[in-house]
Amino acid sequence: IIPALVNGKYDVIMAGMSVTEERKKTISFSKAYMTEPARFFTLNSSPLSTFTSAKNLNLDDDSSATSGTISALNNAMKGMNIGVTVATIHEDFANKYLDSNLKVYPTQDEMNLDLAAGRIDAMLCDVGTAEAFMETSGGSNVVTFGPNVFGGLLGEGVGAGIRQGDADLKAMFDKAIADAAADGTISKISMQWFGKDLAP
């Protein structure tokens, strides 16, 4: 999707793309219009369902508490199969921090189905994405565990991807997002469609 933007196939990426330092080497981003942590999900019958940890894991914090939480996650998931979707910040996180067996999926739907069928032990994804699946009959046995994961390589939130050099277009998006955040529009839309406020 990024190469097609760079090559002029379209002007903006509006696909829930996280703003990361790595991506900013290739494209520009608008201000973030949404923020959402990542979490781990498993079946309610899994021993992982009772795993407890700190509420939040901020990857911008390099304290011993952060490394301790990551270590505890790795100990709990040792030898297990963990799913992530391809070319996402979740795959980046798993490659950097997890010692588990990683299974990479082309789509979230395929990963959801494998988790529900017990073909993987857990998955890592955005909270809202998994919660939508949990509200279906296929995901009714799925539960979350572990901390809210954010910061660091998980990025600064979700923004519109824009070609580097398209300063006028970026300015238009930045203003529209700032106005929509200030007047409550982003919060209202977020509550309507996600059931929670994901405004930055």
Segments and roles (model prediction):
Residues 53-79, 89-97, 174-200:
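Ligand-binding clefts/hinges and TM-proximal coupling segments of bilobed small-molecule sensing domains
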Residues 1-72, 146-153:
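Acidic, polar ligand-binding/catalytic clefts
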Residues 76-81, 95-110, 119:
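A local structural motif
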Residues 1-3, 67-69, 103-117, 128:
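Short helix-initiation/N-cap motifs at beta->coil->alpha
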Residues 16-26, 93-96, 113-117, 121-154, ...:
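A ligand-binding cleft/hinge motif common to bilobed small-molecule-binding domains
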Residues 1-2, 12, 18-22, 46-48, ...:
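Solvent-exposed loop/turn segments at secondary-structure junctions
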Residues 11-12, 121-122, 159:
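Short, Asp-centered acidic motifs that coordinate Mg2+ and/or phosphate
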Residues 35-42, 127, 131-175, 196-200:
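Periplasmic-binding protein-like
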